[in-house]
Amino acid sequence: RQMCIRDRDKHDYGKGFYLTENIELAKEWAVCRPTETNGWVHKYELDISDLKILDFQKYDVLSWLAELMKHRDAADTKRYKVLSKKFIEKFGIDTSTYDVIKGWRANASYFYIAKEFVRDNVDTDILEELLSLGGLGIQYCIKSELAYSKLTENKKGSIRVEYSVFNDKYNQRDVRARENMHDLIESDANKVTNVFSTLF
């Protein structure tokens, strides 16, 4: 399985090595920070035999949000700090025994969903549809030494990424996603009945 990678120390699923199978998204992620410097995409192959993989796409979206809350704060209020602990206890998954975690990448627009959700502005019935609007891709997080040992770099596959081209694509994608998400949140489809604070 060939993957493109951008290394992160701390991110959505905690400390690990983050990859995607989508090379175009990898290019955008390589230059998504406002440093105005060109980036690189490195290609790796991951042998997934004998690896224990947690795929958040196979679980309720609330489990993914709980994992996100473990590592990133969606708000800094007392209410959020109290309720997020309860939310994680109820919907969280113990990821400590997994070699690889697969799931959505919580980029700016995805994190916008999380913030609106904890403010009780989003009904759980539209959460999955909201996630589909971002178009920001699926990522893999390499968590264990065993998984690291099964990574092989394609040294001839590195690609230089122009900041001026792909940072603009990244920003345009994010703007479109936020607009689409905002429209859905403000639509009649969002009943605002089954919300964050009602789930305990």
Regions found by a protein language model. Name each.
Residues 13-18:
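A short, exposed loop/beta-hairpin motif centered on an aromatic-Gly-Thr core
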Residues 1-5:
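Short, small-residue-biased leader/transition segments that mark boundaries at the very start
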Residues 7, 11-12, 32-38, 43-200:
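Conserved NAD+-utilizing ADP-ribose enzyme module
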